[in-house]
From Swiss-Prot:
Gene3D superfamilies xref list: Ribosomal protein L14
Phylogenetic classification of the source organism: Bacteria, Pseudomonadati, Aquificota, Aquificia, Aquificales
Domain of life, per lineage: Bacteria
Protein name per its UniProtKB record: Large ribosomal subunit protein uL14
Function, in words: Binds to 23S rRNA. Forms part of two intersubunit bridges in the 70S ribosome.
GO MF, any single term: large ribosomal subunit rRNA binding
Length: 121
């Protein structure tokens, strides 16, 4: 479960390393989970990256440490909370996605992110 003020790892090569959730605009609830789009601000970034510290982006959550129940009854959880930064058109900011991502991201319509990921779980 991701809420406001939660720190997330960034799972792409956009240059950002850590981001903080500042809003959950598209979810009519307090918490965000896998495949939700959230508003984030960059807290740690590489100096030569595209994403700069202090900038505000939208991001999709691709991994959560809290387990999520799937319709078939199985559960999925990861070791960390991670997201992929998006540009204003909903496309990934980076050109690579690092680590596995959840199948729910592809089912939501983010097929570009799923094709860049090394593994879809």
């Amino acid at each position: 479960m991701i809420q406001r003020q939660t720190y997330l790892n960034v799972a792409d090569n956009s240059g950002a390393k850590k981001v903080q959730v500042i809003g959950i605009p598209y979810a009519p609830r307090k918490y965000a989970t896998l495949r939700d789009v959230v508003t984030v601000t960059v807290k740690e970034a590489l100096p030569q990256g595209n994403a700069k510290k202090g900038k505000i982006y939208r991001a999709i959550i691709v991994r959560t440490a809290k387990e999520v129940r799937r319709p078939d009854g199985s559960y999925i959880k990861f070791d960390d909370n991670a997201c992929v930064l998006l540009n204003q058109y909903g496309e990934p900011l980076g050109t690579r996605v690092l680590g596995p991502i959840a199948r729910e991201v592809r089912n939501k319509g983010f097929t570009k992110i799923a094709s860049l990921a090394p593994e879809v779980v």
